[in-house]
């Protein structure tokens, strides 16, 4: 968790108090290294952010200042159902998640030099936790709809299935219905909002065309000879970074 690096009470406290100074020292030190191009982090604990908003806001500002654009903080809510939350000892509820997402959106929506918002939250759900029911999926969708109505940007919604002993069976019908609703109602619309027509993304690395993957040796002049150009179609590429956007271009 990015926000608990050298935090106060990591062992003793349920919600350790974030310490902005060492995080700022680390990230600014990394950013000052000219050898470093892309700098991203990953997980953030939304409950800790919500319970310590003042310190977390200072850290968020540091992240926006130092990270490359397109950075994502993965928030593991896992479930918006209070019953699932209680039965599985989850450490973040929907209220805390909303507070954390609002803070990240407040500072992270600004676009960087490559064309993407500087820092956005990602949201994780897990299916198959104990206490889950059809009500659970309804509460998850309700939360997502509220976040959308409130105008928050979410970079991606990740839906996983729990593995291991001691968990209940997943209702396949409910799970597929929830997953399809998320893909149709949120994934596409959120990307369209984040990347409206006319958005320019710089530094895209083209990786694949017609089922063929681009390799380092293909950067040489012998691979650029016009006489060996492939057939027309869609060429796919991505920017370097965490959770990069897949870009397709006619070529």
Predicted regions and their residues:
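Conserved SAM/AdoMet-binding glycine-rich loop
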Residues: 1-122, 127-132
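Short aromatic-enriched loop/helix-cap "lid" or pocket-rim segments at secondary-structure transitions
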Residues: 10-11, 53, 135-137, 169-173
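Auxiliary Fe-S-binding modules of radical SAM enzymes
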Residues: 32-37, 108-111, 115-116, 138-141, ...
């Amino acid at each position: 968790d990015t926000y608990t690096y050298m935090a106060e009470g990591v062992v003793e406290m349920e919600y350790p108090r974030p310490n902005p100074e060492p995080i700022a020292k680390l990230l600014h030190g990394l950013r000052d290294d000219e050898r470093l191009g892309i700098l991203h982090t990953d997980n953030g604990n939304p409950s800790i952010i919500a319970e310590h908003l003042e310190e977390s806001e200072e850290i968020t500002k540091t992240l926006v200042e130092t990270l490359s654009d397109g950075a994502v903080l993965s928030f593991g809510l896992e479930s918006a159902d209070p019953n699932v939350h209680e039965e599985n000892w989850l450490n973040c509820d929907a209220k805390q998640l909303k507070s954390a997402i609002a803070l990240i959106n407040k500072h992270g929506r600004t676009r960087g030099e490559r064309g993407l918002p500087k820092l956005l939250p990602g949201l994780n759900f897990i299916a198959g936790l104990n206490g889950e029911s059809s009500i659970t999926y309804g509460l998850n969708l309700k939360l997502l709809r509220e976040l959308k109505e409130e105008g928050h940007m979410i970079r991606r919604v990740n839906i996983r299935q729990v593995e291991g002993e001691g968990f209940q069976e997943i209702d396949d019908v409910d799970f597929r219905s929830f997953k399809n609703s998320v893909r149709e109602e949120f994934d596409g619309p959120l990307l369209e909002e984040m990347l409206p027509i006319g958005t320019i993304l710089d530094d895209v690395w083209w990786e694949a065309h017609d089922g063929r993957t681009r390799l380092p040796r293909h950067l040489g002049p012998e691979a650029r000879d016009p006489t060996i150009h492939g057939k027309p179609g869609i060429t796919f590429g991505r920017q370097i970074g965490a959770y990069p956007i897949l870009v397709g271009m006619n070529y």
